[in-house]
Amino acid sequence: LPNTEGYVATLYFYLLISNGRRLCAQFVRAKDMLRLVAVDGILTSLTAVLFNVLFLVVLKVGPIGVLWATMASDFCSAVFLFWAANLRRNLHLRRYDGRLMRKMLAYALPLVPSLMCWNVIYSSDHLFVANLLENGKELDGLFYYSYSIASIMQVVASIFNEAWQLSAVTEEEGRERFFSRVFGIYQGVMFIGAAGLVLLCRPFFAVYVNEASYEAWRYSPFLTLGAVYSCLGGFLNTIYMVKKRSGLSLMTSAAGAVCNCVLNFVLILWMGVNGAALATFLSYLLIFVMRAVNTRGLLRMDYSPLKLAVNTALLVTECVLLICEVPLWGLWCSLCAAGVLALNFGDLYGMARQLLRRRRR
């Protein structure tokens, strides 16, 4: 890795501590100790702030202090979870199960290159922009800022996945109906959120970045659209997890990574930086379509294809209208966003009513 001289040992310790904390958190979540998980989340946030203040403000150790603060916070979290959940009772070093270990490795090994493929989709955009275009490094800096809105979608998805994965594994009765219903609500939330964020794209960048970086808004719409299908593809990856078919996860991710590299080379030369954003969207769309097809043999889920197609068409139209700055683009984009809201309102309203009923009980 570039610019990591002298930090390799620290990075290894960071990975060890971070994964140890994640292991404890997953184990506690599997034991259905959700309140403890919530308390740990709050404490981890507080300790992260305190350690950052300690290393950066008090001790003034420089940028490496951010990494040290994260390590210290994760270590405290792991110790807290191990002690509060009494995980020592579940730790039996002498009861090694070789057969179970082989099963776990067979499932886990394809996940490593699969994750690398997702990183290729992200990093290849920057690599191609920086090297194929004139003033590529400057344009890549703008492209980096354009990920800001798409990252909001990813944060929402990560919060959802934290709660969703456990339910996906434990909910066995009526699983197909359960997955279909959750997917319908999830795609509604994703498309409504994306339509609203695309509509607010220009004012967001006017406030969020300086004047020199304002033009980054032009590349954000297609990246936001790509984030939607990245999240939907991640949802379908849960089916692979439930059925222990991680090899299919690797196959679809690899196809997306190859597609992204090819499209980047073609579209960036044709469209400029927005070619990279469009390539990202099309790559995530390919991953979603492949997963929607090959998960049919694992779990017959209702994707509501017509609704999905209309949502996509409205959002693509909104993105194109905004990027092309057509006359009265604000009005037309607002109408597209309103169409997405109207199309998905029923599912969200039903979910809200159900949550309110549970709360009253």
Language-model segments: residues:
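Helix-terminus/linker motif at the lipid-water interface of multi-pass membrane proteins
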Residues: 58-59, 116-152, 167-170, 202-212, ...
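Helix-loop junctions and terminal segments of transmembrane helices
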Residues: 30, 146, 150-176, 180-186, ...
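Alpha-helical transmembrane segments of polytopic membrane transporters and translocases
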Residues: 75, 110, 125-127, 139-157, ...
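Hydrophobic alpha-helical transmembrane segments
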Residues: 9, 38-87, 254-260, 273-294, ...
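Interfacial/gating helices of multi-pass transporter permease domains
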Residues: 5, 63-66, 100-107, 111, ...
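Membrane-proximal transmembrane or re-entrant/amphipathic helices at the cytosolic face
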Residues: 301, 321-361
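Interhelical loop/hinge segments that connect adjacent transmembrane helices in multipass membrane
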Residues: 63-67, 81-122, 167-177, 297-312, ...
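Alpha-helical transmembrane segments of multi-pass membrane transport and lipid-handling proteins
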Residues: 1, 5, 10, 157, ...
